[in-house]
């Protein structure tokens, strides 16, 4: 019985240590989430303005008939996917949702590796795709908790350049959209060619009229459209990082709660075993005393 009590006590101490670790990790993820949510709000100021400028310009007569490749649809022979995952685990179902969505998409729409190209952001996704022999053109590992544009700008620009050079004919970003601390949604968002423009961004009183573009519209579009697309992709990365921190916080909170439940169950077992041991000792003492009479 003494051995059993000792084993239960060791399990309680071990679980308490685990609970302290997961609780600390929960607090770290919570702090990262607050920073990421603020970064997302700050970025939206810039993103909203460039969306408004681009939408107004494209809905005006100033650029009608442009043959800019970022606006023109072409027969789709190959599709590019930017897939955003985390660099490590302990984030619940964050990665599994994205990877499942990508595998379903590839199974449904592509029969050969040459039909698609993956640009992977995050070690989990890179390792997953490479282990299955899938077509990973570029990858970025070790993304910061609050990634700057300088860190991701090169791979974003590379994706846009690959589209412009017709290495693929459409570009999507697959990521987890942050809804709140408990919820995220998988998004498969088309970035190129530029098709869907938010009508709310171009109200009648904001549409550009009576302006001239210098030196000419094609030069303006050549500068503006990549910047517009890159801002959307960067926004998706910030959004995904926010969802990752929320998932990490929730996962560690769940782990902490589970550890506390285990501790409670073990404590009950310990008390019962201790009570049984004491009862047995009393019984043995009484039996011994009776034997001496």
Swiss-Prot record:
Mind telling me which GO cellular component terms the entry cites?
plasma membrane; proton-transporting ATP synthase complex
Q: How does it sit in the membrane?
A: Peripheral membrane protein
Keywords tagged on the record:
ATP synthesis, Cell membrane, CF(1), Hydrogen ion transport, Ion transport, Membrane, Transport
Q: Does the keyword Flavoprotein apply?
A: no
For this protein, the record's PROSITE patterns field holds: ATPASE_GAMMA
Any GO BP annotation = proton motive force-driven plasma membrane ATP synthesis
Taxonomy, superkingdom: Bacteria
Indicate whether Transcription appears among the record's keywords.
no
- Tell me the GO molecular function terms: ATP binding; proton-transporting ATP synthase activity, rotational mechanism
Q: What is its main location?
A: membrane
Compartments where found: Cell membrane
Q: Which Pfam families match?
A: ATP-synt
Coiled-coil intervals, chain numbering? none
Q: Which InterPro entries match?
A: ATP_synth_F1_ATPase_gsu, ATP_synth_F1_gsu, ATP_synth_F1_gsu_CS
**Function as written in the Swiss-Prot or TrEMBL entry:** Produces ATP from ADP in the presence of a proton gradient across the membrane. The gamma chain is believed to be important in regulating ATPase activity and the flow of protons through the CF(0) complex.
Sequence similarity: Belongs to the ATPase gamma chain family.
PANTHER family for this protein: ATP SYNTHASE GAMMA CHAIN, ATP SYNTHASE SUBUNIT GAMMA, MITOCHONDRIAL
Q: How does it assemble?
A: F-type ATPases have 2 components, CF(1) - the catalytic core - and CF(0) - the membrane proton channel. CF(1) has five subunits: alpha(3), beta(3), gamma(1), delta(1), epsilon(1). CF(0) has three main subunits: a, b and c.
What's the name of the protein?
Answer: ATP synthase gamma chain
Q: Which gene encodes it?
A: atpG
């Amino acid at each position: 019985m003494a051995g059993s009590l000792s084993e239960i006590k060791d399990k309680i101490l071990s679980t308490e240590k685990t609970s302290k670790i997961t609780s600390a990790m929960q607090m770290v993820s919570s702090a990262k989430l607050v920073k990421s949510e603020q970064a997302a709000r700050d970025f939206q100021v810039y993103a909203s303005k460039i969306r408004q400028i681009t939408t107004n310009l494209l809905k005006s007569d100033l650029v009608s008939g442009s043959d800019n490749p970022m606006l023109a649809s072409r027969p789709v022979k190959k599709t590019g996917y930017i897939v955003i995952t985390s660099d490590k685990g302990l984030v619940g179902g964050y990665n599994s949702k994205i990877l499942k969505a990508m595998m379903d998409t590839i199974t449904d729409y592509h029969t050969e590796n040459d039909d698609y190209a993956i640009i992977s952001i995050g070690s989990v996704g890179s390792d997953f795709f490479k282990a299955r022999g899938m077509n990973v053109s570029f990858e970025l590992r070790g993304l910061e908790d609050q990634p700057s544009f300088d860190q991701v700008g090169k791979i974003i620009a590379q994706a846009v350049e690959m589209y412009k050079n017709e290495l693929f004919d459409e570009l999507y970003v697959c990521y987890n959209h942050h809804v709140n601390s408990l919820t995220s949604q998988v998004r498969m968002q088309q970035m190129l060619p530029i098709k869907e423009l938010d009508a709310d961004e171009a109200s009648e009183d904001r549409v550009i009229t009576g302006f001239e573009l210098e030196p000419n519209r094609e030069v303006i579009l050549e500068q503006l459209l990549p910047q517009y697309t890159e801002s959307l992709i960067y926004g998706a990365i910030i959004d995904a990082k926010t969802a990752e921190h929320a998932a990490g916080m929730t996962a560690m909170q769940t782990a902490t709660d589970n550890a506390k439940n285990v501790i409670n169950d073990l404590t009950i077992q310990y008390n019962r075993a201790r009570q049984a041991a004491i009862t047995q000792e009393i019984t043995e003492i009484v039996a011994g005393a009776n034997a001496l009479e």
